[in-house]
């Protein structure tokens, strides 16, 4: 049962259009331990959706849920995570997941947190499972996988179990909520580097500020012409956090060394189909649009991890790796590996 103090804090928060991070932490912490009734959770999520997500909402909720979560055994310096908010309705191939594998094959320390499909036909877990990348490993085996390959995948529910308290209400509301934004931010590895796509460009600056609050040293938040990816069909807005400073700029496909394509050329299917398309790209047989879209995001990852001085040079590195078979060989080594010992 919700205590009077907790309920009074919640009511005050709902009436406050400009909450502080500390107030948000105070309101979201009871949510992490199941202290709210469903009606209270619905009121909180609906109010935030109606007035618009603020920096305090996102930063405070992130801090509350990270404090309640289970960190990955390896955290911090040198690690990267990558994900998007989803919700752009594009149903493309799994660009970010494919780019994460390219980045790992190229030396980026990638600890990717994700889940099965929610708003698309194929979530990151769906396509990785179809690629025979071992999933749902216990932490010790996941560490062995990471040490062997520069890559591991962490199921979000296993590391952020407190989110389960919200799921029934999220499903009942049937609209995007704060937790669509929070998902990629609640990275169990507490990474130093992050690339995150947002379907709603109004959130770009806010999320960059949240990453600064959470201690990221270098992060990119991107919105590409209506999608939560770096676009091959138009310009992409980038909010870049580097050493505490945030800059905003626009990049075009031509500026980073790729061609333009129609968004429809990136249309994807379910996990099995997208895995097949990914293998074709890794083997240099896939459509040029797929190669360039994956290279654009992988290039941003190489740049964010400070492996190259510009995104364009990162794109060139990714394209070279796809052309010479480096990624295909990496996948052949690491798919179906056991990591039991």
Swiss-Prot record:
Extent of the signal sequence: none
Cellular component terms per the entry's GO annotation: cytosol
UniProt-annotated binding residues for anthranilate 2: 170
Gene Ontology biological process terms from the UniProt entry: L-tryptophan biosynthetic process
Residues that hold Mg(2+) 1 according to the record: 96, 229
MF GO annotations: anthranilate phosphoribosyltransferase activity; magnesium ion binding
Cofactor(s) listed in the protein's UniProt record: Mg(2+)
Binding site for Mg(2+) 2: 228-229
Subunit structure: Homodimer.
Protein name: Anthranilate phosphoribosyltransferase
Organism encoding this protein: Corynebacterium diphtheriae (strain ATCC 700971 / NCTC 13129 / Biotype gravis)
Lineage: Bacteria, Bacillati, Actinomycetota, Actinomycetes, Mycobacteriales
Gene: trpD
């Amino acid at each position: 049962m919700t205590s009077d103090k907790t309920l009074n804090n919640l009511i005050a928060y709902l009436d406050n259009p400009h909450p502080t991070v500390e107030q948000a932490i105070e309101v979201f912490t009871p949510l992490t331990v199941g202290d709210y009734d469903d009606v209270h959770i619905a009121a909180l999520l609906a109010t935030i959706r109606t007035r618009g997500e603020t920096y305090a909402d996102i930063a405070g909720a992130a801090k509350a849920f990270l404090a309640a979560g289970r960190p990955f055994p390896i955290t911090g310096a040198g690690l990267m995570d990558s994900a998007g908010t989803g919700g752009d309705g594009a149903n493309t191939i799994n660009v970010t997941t494919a780019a994460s594998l390219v980045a790992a094959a190229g030396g980026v320390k990638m600890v990717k947190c994700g889940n099965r499909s929610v708003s698309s036909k194929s979530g990151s877990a769906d396509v990785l499972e179809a690629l025979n990348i071992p999933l749902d490993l216990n932490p010790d085996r996941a560490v062995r996988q990471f040490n062997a390959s520069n890559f591991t995948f962490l199921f979000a529910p296993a590391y952020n179990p407190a989110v389960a308290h919200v799921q029934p209400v999220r499903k009942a509301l049937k609209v995007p909520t704060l937790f669509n934004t929070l998902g990629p931010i609640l990275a169990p590895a507490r990474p130093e580097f992050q690339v995150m796509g947002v379907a709603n460009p109004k959130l770009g600056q806010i999320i960059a500020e949240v990453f600064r609050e959470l201690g990221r040293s270098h992060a990119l938040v991107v919105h590409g012409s209506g999608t939560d990816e770096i676009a091959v069909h138009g310009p992409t807005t980038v909010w870049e956090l580097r050493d505490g400073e945030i800059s905003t700029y626009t990049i075009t496909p031509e500026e980073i060394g790729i061609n333009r394509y129609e968004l429809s050329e990136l249309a994807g299917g379910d996990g099995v189909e997208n895995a097949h398309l990914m293998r074709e790209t890794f083997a240099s047989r896939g459509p040029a649009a797929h190669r360039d879209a994956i290279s654009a995001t992988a290039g941003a990852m190489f740049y964010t991890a400070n492996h190259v001085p510009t995104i364009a040079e990162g794109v060139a590195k990714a394209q070279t790796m796809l052309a010479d078979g480096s990624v295909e060989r990496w996948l052949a080594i690491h798919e179906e590996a056991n990591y039991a010992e």
